[in-house]
Swiss-Prot record:
Cofactor(s) this protein cannot do without: Mg(2+)
Record keyword Plastid present: no
Lineage: Bacteria, Pseudomonadati, Pseudomonadota, Gammaproteobacteria, Enterobacterales
Organism in which the protein naturally occurs: Pectobacterium carotovorum subsp. carotovorum (strain PC1)
Protein name: tRNA dimethylallyltransferase
Keyword set includes Magnesium: yes
């Protein structure tokens, strides 16, 4: 698409960044200066009852700056990048029709990429095929299923960990249903996003600063009674660590603690380490991102001014 064609499209803003980088604060501040409506791009914030461990904006913040696509699912439900694209496009169209600018804020980079580039049409879920895969996994184990995927689709097998049964079974299911591998089907993207997108990434200037912010926020979550929140979920007995909700950083480690597998101090240590690993993956995505304007989270006023300047140009 040419620059002239892009300029004729309605505007949208992406604010991306690693966890604990100040994305939400920047997005909320922008509401005072630009006619924006916020859409959350976060695979953890979609879940109801998972507030403290996800650093979800609190009730007061949401009253001041409502976020769409927050609290839309029960933790027992799953949500795909395709689901996100469908919902986000609907919300963006509604915001644009009202004469305002959709501002998408979050750290789930796969969602941003899927929305920006479009998704290849994959075969719909097939319950019977999925059941056969899960039954086979019970017999031989997920390690063996991963070896099977390595023979069918070695590229996908490199990306998918043997301890990720949801993604592993989906990759196998796609092949058994369509006869094509997940890698083959995702080589071609779908329709590009019909918006002029202004893309920003916010992060501290150094890794050390980001690590400090992550550790500080994890301890703040614990002080806000994250353990009690996790215990309420644990007590339901219909949730487990194979589910995307409980695989979220912090919750997975809290689950191990509540199960008696590790003690409290080990849970805290692992939770902080897992959050740092998440931030590292997010930064890896962003360093390879095209057309992104970097902002320093330690200089919030300058970051705010830069976004306003770029969007208003």
């Amino acid at each position: 698409m040419s620059d002239v064609e892009k300029a004729s499209l309605p505007p949208a803003i992406f604010i991306m960044g690693p966890t604990a980088s100040g994305k939400t604060a920047l997005a909320m501040a922008l509401r005072e200066y630009l006619p924006v409506e916020l859409i959350s791009v976060d695979s953890a914030l979609i879940y109801k009852g998972m507030d403290i461990g996800t650093a979800k904006p609190n009730a007061e913040e949401l009253a001041l700056a409502p976020h769409r696509l927050i609290d839309i699912l029960d933790p027992a439900e799953s949500y795909s990048a395709a689901d996100f694209c469908r919902d986000a496009l609907r919300e963006m169209a509604e915001i644009t029709a009202a004469g305002r600018i959709p501002l998408l804020v979050g750290g789930t980079m796969l969602y941003f990429k899927a929305l920006l580039e479009g998704l290849s049409p994959l075969p719909p879920a097939d319950a019977a095929v999925r059941q056969r895969i899960e039954e086979q996994a019970k017999e031989v184990g997920w390690e063996a299923m991963h070896r099977q995927l390595s023979e069918i689709d070695p590229v996908a097998a490199i990306r998918i960990h043997p301890n990720d049964p949801q993604r592993l079974s989906r990759a196998l299911e796609v092949f058994f249903v369509s006869g094509n591998t997940l890698t083959e089907l995702t080589k071609t993207s779908g329709d590009a996003l019909p918006y002029q997108v202004h893309q920003f990434a916010i992060a501290p200037a150094t890794r050390e600063l980001l690590h400090q912010r992550i550790e500080q926020r994890f301890h703040q979550m614990l002080a806000a009674d994250f353990e009690r929140e996790a215990r309420l979920l644990f007590a339901r007995q219909d949730l487990h660590t194979d589910m995307p909700s409980i695989r979220c950083v912090g919750y997975r480690q809290m689950w191990s603690y509540l199960s008696g597998e590790i003690d409290y101090d080990e849970m805290v240590y692992r939770g902080i380490c897992a959050t740092r690993q998440l931030a590292k993956r997010q930064m890896t995505w962003l360093r390879g991102w095209d057309d992104v304007c970097w902002l320093d989270s330690e200089k919030p006023t300058e970051a705010l001014d830069k976004v306003i300047e770029v969007v208003s140009a």
